């Protein structure tokens, strides 16, 4: 279980995240929504420890994440994989090598420097690409792929870390609706089939409603809503996005529509389960 207690981050005189407190049970899929500048990205970066909290504590399964240093911190960043809006791939390297880079924190320094990957790791990487439906791109330079394909490569690389938690920072913000749906289907498939906790930042209400069992709304660095999608009333939306402008849900839509009567696994059709090898 994740436990955040009074987590705050200040940049000079500006408070980006203010006294955030919540628990997340293992295996939950959580969407964090809010306007740009609400503190969503800073919060995820603190969980991953790319940014340190100014105060407060972050704990995961008894591990004091906010106090980790050295090798223990590197191990946490292995167990807490993160994908970004910008994909963060190495464009000149082929797709397979980019995916294999997810194994670096599982390996010795010498093997990591030499980029020597085992046959088992290569099979695992191909399996991850097959699961995301892009195995045919394995030998292409990553920079030649579309945005949606690059994001799926980033997800495959994250799977190679064998994470306990997957953080997704605006994973569909730069994608068209079709690719946005494919990426969100993949994240939910990982959550449901592997039992991995997924926490994703989203601008869009419809995406949060369709994919997340829990939604956390942020405004001005604070949590102003925490509940199920069905509880996102007009008043809750106004608290998140601001009552000074008449926010309509269509304004924050990516046009990802899943029929209400369809079972959740239908949206993940075509995504194949991946048997992850042991470390």
Curated annotation (Swiss-Prot):
Chief location bin: membrane
Protein's cellular compartments: Cell inner membrane
EC number: 7.3.2.2
Any one GO cellular component localisation term in the record: plasma membrane
UniProt KW keywords: ATP-binding, Cell inner membrane, Cell membrane, Membrane, Nucleotide-binding, Phosphonate transport, Plasmid, Translocase, Transport
Complex and partners: The complex is composed of two ATP-binding proteins (PhnC), two transmembrane proteins (PhnE) and a solute-binding protein (PhnD).
Protein name: Phosphonates import ATP-binding protein PhnC
Species in which this protein is naturally found: Rhizobium meliloti (strain 1021)
Record gene name: phnC
């Amino acid at each position: 279980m994740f436990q955040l207690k009074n987590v705050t981050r200040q940049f000079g005189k500006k408070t980006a995240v203010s006294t955030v407190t919540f628990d997340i049970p293992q295996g939950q899929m959580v969407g964090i929504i809010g306007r740009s500048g609400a503190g969503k990205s800073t919060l995820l970066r603190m969980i991953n420890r790319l940014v340190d909290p100014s105060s407060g504590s972050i704990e995961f399964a008894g591990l004091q994440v906010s106090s980790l240093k050295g090798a223990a911190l590197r191990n946490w960043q292995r167990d807490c994989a993160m994908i970004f809006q910008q994909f963060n791939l190495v464009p000149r390297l082929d797709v397979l090598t980019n995916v294999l880079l997810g194994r670096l924190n599982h390996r010795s320094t010498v093997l990591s420097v030499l980029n020597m990957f085992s046959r088992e790791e290569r099979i695992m990487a191909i399996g991850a690409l097959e699961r995301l439906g892009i195995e045919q791109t394995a030998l292409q330079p990553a920079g030649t792929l579309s945005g949606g394909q690059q994001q799926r490569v980033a997800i495959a690389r994250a799977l190679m870390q064998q994470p306990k938690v997957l953080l997704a920072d605006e994973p569909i913000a730069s994608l068209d609706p079709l690719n946005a749906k494919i990426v969100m289907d993949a994240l939910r498939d990982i959550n449901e089939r592997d039992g991995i906790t997924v926490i994703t930042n989203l601008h869009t209400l419809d995406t949060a409603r369709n994919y997340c069992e829990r939604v956390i709304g942020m405004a001005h660095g604070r949590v102003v809503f925490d509940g199920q999608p069905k509880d996102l009333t007009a008043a809750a939306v106004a608290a998140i996005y601001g009552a000074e402008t008449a926010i309509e849900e269509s304004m924050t839509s990516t046009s990802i529509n899943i029929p209400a009567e369809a079972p959740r696994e239908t949206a993940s059709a075509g995504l194949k389960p991946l048997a992850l090898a042991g470390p």
